[in-house]
Amino acid sequence: MRPAPLLFGMLLASQALAMEALDDSTMASVSGQGGISLETSSQGWSASNVSYTQDGRSLNLRDVSNRAANGTTSTSQSILDVQDGQLQVQHSASPQVLAVNNIEMEGSSKSFGSLRAFYTLGATLKLKGGGASGVSGIAVDDSRLSLTDVTFYYRDNGFDLIVKGLSFDTYLDNAYLDIVSGSTGQEVKLNLGDARFVGTVGGISLDLAHGDPTATPATPGAPDPRDTNASRSFGKLNMDLHLGGSLSVASGGASGEGIRIRPDLNIGSSLFQYQDEGILRAENFSGTLRSLGGLTIDLAQDAGSSYAQVAFQDLKLNATLGGLIIGNPTNQKLGSLAIDLNFADDGAKQNWLKLRPGGDPNSGAKGLTADISWNMANSSVSLTDNGNSMWFSGLRTNGTGQLTLDLTKSCAGGAVTGCYAGTQSDMGKGSYNGHFDGLRLGLSNIKGGYSFDGLRVGSADAPLQGGTELLVLMEIFPAYDFNLNGQITLLPGGNSGEGLRYNADFVFSDARAAITVDETGKGLWLAGTTYDMHFRDGSVDVSNNGIELRKGTYWSKLEVSDLRWGDRATGTSLGRLVLKRFELGSTLAVSSGGAGALCVGGSGANAGACSASGGRWEDRGNEGVSVKLKNVFVRDTAIESTSNGVATDEKRNQIVWETNRVNGVAGTGSQLVVDNLSTSDGNPSDPNANTYGFNADLNLDVAPTRVCTNNGGSCTPVTPDPLGFAVNGRIHFKEINVDRLQHVHPSGGAVTSMYGIKVQNADISANLTATPIN
């Protein structure tokens, strides 16, 4: 006997037995009511494997389940009705949890990791037939999709990344879903109409206590108590986006089967905010995201492993972040920031991302590896300050490399399950100690570079001008080619409260950087450069005073094979340069508001006093950027190693200039060495005090300034005052010490020319405004 008909008959019989006639009094109380109400209860579902297969390759989700978040049974209620020609659906459900035990790719022994998501789903939909054409498709009006009370756990090698307090509300009005003819065939097209997306992230934290606290995994209501840092957060995010345009999805990837997503999105009058103690806020965020060829998603395999590829031949991102605030919302504003980024394939320079299971090979079998390639051409970034704009014009960048993402734990606090040990900070040597507690981003063979044509002030087609040299103090070069290896590991919680802490190692090699360069590529170049940088126990916070970056313990070595004047490759060499730095407690602070009103070329707190001193009073408005850099240089108290009489300690402040080398070989020429430089507070009662440091305070504005043209001894003022890139700077320190000044001969060794050099109580102010020469 076939069991299905028998089971169906039994179900019908049970429903018939449950039916009974209503008497007259009961019938009289029944009123007409349309619609359907469905109430369901379920113990959830599970699947041992869910696979997506493409061109014979598979992405597999192992041990997938969706169950009640509390208890054993989940419930939901759905109400369906038809009013005014629309199908109206209201849906609500009890909290649930979705779990995926492993995310794998066929052909790889590694894994992307596992995840769990606690969530509550709700919806109010108003649907009717007829898409944008009014003939076929679906129209969506006055509808809302909500995902609330979300806590997301991502597990990598036994450690957890936790996203808390997550909620999304999507509002759809005048939206359509159609099947249309696209450039590659039939496409499913979602026209967003008047859409709004409201999202909140309450916090992002890490749980680095390996595995589960008991046989039962941690939940939002019963967190893992073993990691004391698990309660700290990277900060909060809020967004309120008004969206328009369309999103199309078609079959077929870059080759063979796959998926092609074609965005044509508009963002208008939106808000984006990050919150720590202070805030980073864009009060009027707008822009577009478009790709004519679309983004393709493919599954593929090469000699390395299986991977999922996201690629795009073209992508244009245009955005304006208006009303930018850094720090306290009642403070001055920065102005607005606009970006115009154009990604486009150009021969071997392509745009793609290959995602592979497993992270850094020294961080376990789980995690994420991404091979990357990018090419961005003819782009720009602009800053508007009190209505005056400045463009970083002709921005170009391209490169390739590999990124890894892992959750790791150091053995510094004692050997525990899953920790990694090391004793070496040099990445080129064994036992590298670059494994720390936190979320680790690894950088491997990132070969790339960037350049931009120069500054334009006033309009996007204004003449190119200088001024980029003023940014070198913040190590922003006008042009830079490099090969980068290293890592940065992040922990939630800053120096206080929310924010982040970090440990990092970066090695730039085979690099070439411009200090100053003109439109022909001629200038002052750092050629054949190696830059080795290390950060320990640093932090980043957003306070009411702005963004505060603390470098913690920092040491670096910049070695320039040739300081060239002219062409980057063939210009005249001024010699070899080595700069070592060892700092403790250095900081960088960025805040809203520039110089405001100030006296240029004189002194005085108001216009009258300024004019009386021979100066010129300028009011640069309440917007702009202020930057404060403090470098605390630490004295090396013992020489651990030497070469030809010169100290070679890794953590030491030292400047070496070498000329007259034999065939350009380091160490074969004559050297001038400024050795063991350090700062001091210059306090006789506490000679070891060193907190004041070497300070550079910069106010950056886009503002008009007075310019005159030299005509045979007279200077004719330019009318009106032209706009320029204005920098008001102040350099100040209490004391700088240099242990010794050495002259070094390649065969005769080092001779100390001076001992115990001191420079005290310097306070130098300057005002520079760069305008076009023509």
Regions found by a protein language model. Name each.
Residues 13-16:
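N-terminal signal peptide c-region/cleavage motif recognized by signal peptidases
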Residues 21-22, 29-600, 608-774:
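N-terminal low-complexity, acidic/Ser/Thr/Gly/Pro-rich segments
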Residues 1-11:
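Sec-dependent signal peptide recognition
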